[in-house]
């Protein structure tokens, strides 16, 4: 397996990984304007991109996912809850679905809370075993923090859902499993994010202050001091729902 993490605009972290041997790659959370980088890195690895995934409809940056998928002829994926919401064709993801890229396999975990459509991606290298190597956590779990719950409205209800998601879907994963989040310090998508670009489930269970709280305390803490919403959020979300990035992006 090859793996690339790309720091991008708005403290976003994007990903490219795949199987060089069988020449297939996966791109995750591509920021508009970075499409050439993904194409060039995939070419260097000798692994054409076959899957492009957004972990949710982003509110803080324009997605380059649809454009990258069009340029390379790959499937573009969002969670199935976006059917009827997104104004263009995409390949829907369902909880428990498995995507293949040669010997690299991606297991989809539906993780609502930050947004209703959020997913995390547990990644395996079948040449080395059937256990996951890492999980891409999108805006659900960050290093030292968790995703904000208010972007879809009903922040207390979403915060409670995020607590349930974290406890049942992510913290039950092996403690040694690496996590790669969708943002690092400087992002508007959460409060108190670390500048570290990666962690493990076990480290976060021990040191992430949001993960040792009761459900009631978690909801209260997460909704007490919500950061300002991302600049131009409404326009960004609308563009990402249409799959058309403005020329100013």
Predicted features along the sequence, with ranges:
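Conserved beta-strand hairpin/beta-sheet module of binuclear metal-dependent hydrolase folds
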Residues: 1-48, 121-138, 144
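Divalent metal-coordination and catalytic microenvironments
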Residues: 17, 29, 56, 68, ...
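Active-site neighborhood of phospho(di)ester-bond hydrolases with catalytic His/Asp-centered motifs
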Residues: 27-30, 48-58, 77-80, 110-113, ...
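Active-site environment of divalent metal-dependent phosphoester hydrolases
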Residues: 34, 57-62, 83-86, 116-117, ...
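Active-site metal-binding motif and surrounding structural segment of the metallo-beta-lactamase
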Residues: 34-77
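Active-site-adjacent scaffolding segments
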Residues: 82, 89-148
């Amino acid at each position: 397996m090859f793996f690339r993490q790309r720091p991008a605009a708005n403290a976003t972290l994007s990903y490219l990984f795949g199987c060089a041997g069988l020449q297939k790659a996966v791109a995750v959370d591509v920021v508009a304007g970075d499409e050439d980088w993904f194409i060039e890195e995939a070419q260097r690895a000798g692994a054409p991109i076959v899957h492009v995934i957004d972990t949710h409809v982003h509110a803080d940056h324009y997605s380059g996912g649809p454009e990258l998928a069009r340029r390379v002829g790959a499937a573009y994926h969002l969670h199935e809850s976006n059917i009827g919401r997104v104004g263009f064709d995409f390949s829907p993801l369902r909880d428990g679905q498995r995507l293949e890229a040669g010997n690299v396999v991606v297991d989809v975990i539906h993780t609502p809370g930050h947004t209703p459509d959020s997913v995390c991606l547990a990644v395996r290298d079948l040449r080395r075993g059937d256990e996951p190597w890492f999980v891409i956590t999108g805006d659900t779990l960050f290093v030292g923090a968790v995703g904000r719950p208010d972007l879809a409205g009903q922040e207390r209800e979403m915060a409670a859902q995020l607590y349930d998601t974290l406890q049942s879907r992510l913290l039950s994963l092996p403690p040694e499993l690496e996590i790669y989040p969708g943002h690092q310090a400087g992002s508007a998508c959460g409060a108190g994010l670390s500048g570290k670009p990666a962690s493990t489930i076990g480290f976060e269970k021990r040191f992430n202050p949001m993960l040792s709280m009761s459900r009631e305390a978690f909801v209260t803490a997460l909704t007490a001091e919500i950061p300002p919403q991302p600049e131009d959020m409404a326009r960004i979300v609308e563009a990402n729902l249409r799959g058309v990035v403005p020329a100013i992006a």
